[in-house]
C-alpha cells in the first residue's frame, strides 16, 4: 500500500494499523469526554462534552500522514542503531540482562504502587514537578499514546514494543517504554486528571493540546516497531505473511528455554549495576515526572509532527529512575512472585529483537548474525521437542483430569468386574467339582455296589467236587469234566445248607465235597437231581457263620443288556471265588443239551444268554444282577472254534420250581405219552412217500412207535401220524416236542395236536395224565 513519501507497506499491515489507529482515536475521545464530564462535576473545568476531531481533517488522511512520519522516524533510528549492532556479543548479552532485570523491577514497582493511595500521592507529586514535565513534553508525546494503547491491549502491544526496544543499543529507551507498558489504566486516568488541573495556566494550555494531537498521530507507528522494520521490504503475499506469523509463533513458544542457561550469570551483573546506581537515585528524584504521559483534547495541533529523539542524558536519567524504582520495590515488598513471567516476557522481547535485526540485515544486504541464526536453529529444535512434551503433558493432564472426575465410578466398576470374575470362577469350580463329585460318586457307587455284590455272592458260592475222579472205570475225559464244579447256597436253615448245582456236576455220586470261601470243607449229600433240567440239590451241614444265603431275584424281569456278575470256581479250588462281569446278551434261548455225551442232543434247555467269561468249573455258579440277587445258575457254554463269550444260565424262577421238588421228592415227575418219534427233516424220499406226507410239510415229527395203553394210544395217535403243531406251537423236532410236553408237568392238562394221517390233516387231543 503506497502511503506517500516513497513508503510502501503490505496492504494487510496497512489495514491492521489503520484499525488500531481509529480504535485508539475513538478510545481517547471517549476518555477525554469522560474526564471532561468529571471535571464539570467537580467544577475544575469549563469545557464539557467537547467532541474531538470533529473539525480535523479526514481520518484516513490523518492516519496516512501519521504513519508516514513514523516510518521516516523509524528509518532514522535504524540507521543510528547499525553502528551499535557491531558491539560484541558479550556487551549485547549484558545489556539484555540489565534490561531484563530492570524491566522486572519496573513491573514489580508498578504492582506495589497499585496498593498505595495513588490519587493523593500522585496529585501532589505532579504539582511539584509540573514544570519539568512541561519541559520534556516533546519527548513524552509518543510515550503517552503508547501508554494508552498498552493499557487497552497490554499483552499484545507490550510484546511487540519490547521486540524492538530491547535492542542492546537502545536499552535505556526500552526501559522507559517497558516502564510505561506496565502502567495500568488507573494510572493513566490519574495522570490525565492532574494534567487537566494544570491546564488552567493559559499560556501553557494551547501548547499541551497541540502535543496531544502529535501523540495521537504517533500512536500506531510506536505500537509495533518490529512490524515497521519489515515495511521497507517488498509487499508480502497472504501465504507468505501467514508463514511468517507461524514462524514467529513457534519462536515465541521456545522463549523460556533460550536464555535459561545464562540467567544465573545475568543476575550477578544486575546486582552490580544496581549497587552502582544507588548513590545517584536521590539526586534525580525530581525528574521522575519526565516519564509521565500528558493527555489533552486539542485537535488543532499539527498531526504530522514527528517524535523527538532522546538524548544520552535522558537515557542515563531513565536508567537511574528505574534503579530507584527497583530499590523502592525491594524495600516495600519481599514478594518474588512474577519473576518467571517477567523473564518469559523478556525472552520474547529479545527474540523479537533478534528477528527484527535479522530482517533488517536482509533488507540491507547483510548476513544475519551467526549467533542469532544458531539460536534460532536451537529454538526450532527445542520447539519440536517441547511440542512432543506438551502433547504428552496434555495426554497426561487429560488422563489425570478424567481420573479425578470419575475415579469413584471407575473403582466401583472395576470392583464389580472383579467380583463377577471371582463369582464366575467360584461357580464354575463348584459346578465342575459337583459334576466331578457326581461322576466320582456314581463311579464309586457303582464300584462299591459291584464289589459289595461280589463279596456277598462269594460267601454264598461253594466248590462242589464228586468222587468220580477216583473211579477208574469211568472214561478219563468224563471224569475230568465232572470232578469239579460250583454251587450256590440258596437256603440256610440253622447249620443246614441247601446248595443248588448242575446235575452233570454231581454225576452219579451221592456224596459231594463242599469247600467254602474260607477254605473249610464239608461233605454234602445229594438230595435229588434232574438230568432234563440239569439241576441237582446238595444238602450240607456247617456251623461256619461266614457262609451266607444268597438273595433270590426275579428272572421274569430280566432286561436285555442288563449288567450281571458271574461268581464261580473255574478250574477247581485253586481259583475259587472268581468274579467275572458281563451283560445279558439274549433272552428265552432254547439250548440243546447232550447229557450222556453220546453226541446226540437229549433235551432243549430254556435259558438266557450272557457274555461274561465262563470256564470249566463255573458250572453251577451264580449269576447275580446289579442288586446282588441271584437271577440264574450257570449251565453251559458253547465251546467251538472262533466262538467266545457265549454262555447260558437257567432262569432262577425255573430253578426254584425244580429244587423245590428235588428237596421233597428227590426227583421230577414229567408226563410220558408213550411214543417214539423221528424228525421229518431226517426222512428220506421213500419214507416221506410211505407216510404220504405233503410236499409243503418241512418240519415236525413222525410217530414211529406207540406204547399199548399209553397216553398216546389212549389219545388216538397211531404209527405213521405226522405231528406239525403242538399246543398251538410249531413243532420243529422231537426235542421241541419233549420240551412242550414237560412244560405241562405241573398242570398235566390235555393239549391239542395237528397231524397228517394218510395225507390228510386233522387234530387230536393228547392226554398228559
Curated annotation (Swiss-Prot):
GO biological process: any one? proteolysis
List compositional bias (Polar residues) regions by residue number: 126-137, 247-262, 331-347, 366-390
Q: Which family does it belong to?
A: Belongs to the peptidase S1C family.
| Compositional bias segments (type: Basic and acidic residues) | 21-64, 71-108, 138-186, 264-296, 310-330, 348-364
Q: What is its EC number?
A: 3.4.21.-
Alphabetized UniProt keyword annotations:
Cell membrane, Hydrolase, Membrane, Protease, Serine protease, Transmembrane, Transmembrane helix
Cite the record's Basic residues compositional bias ranges. 1-20
Q: Subcellular location, in the record's words?
A: Cell membrane
Spans traversing the lipid bilayer: 410-430
One cellular component term (GO) for this entry is: plasma membrane
* Protein's membrane topology: Single-pass membrane protein
Query: Ranges for the PDZ domain?
Result: 680-733
The organism encoding this protein is Staphylococcus aureus (strain MSSA476)
Spans annotated as Disordered: 1-390
Which Pfam families did the record assign?
Answer: PDZ_2, Trypsin_2
GO MF, one example:
serine-type endopeptidase activity
Listed InterPro entries: Chloro_Bact_Ser_Proteases, PDZ, PDZ_sf, Peptidase_S1_PA, Peptidase_S1_PA_chymotrypsin, Peptidase_S1C
SMART domains noted in UniProt: PDZ
Quote the catalytic residue positions.
504 (charge relay system), 534 (charge relay system), 619 (charge relay system)
The protein's name: Serine protease HtrA-like
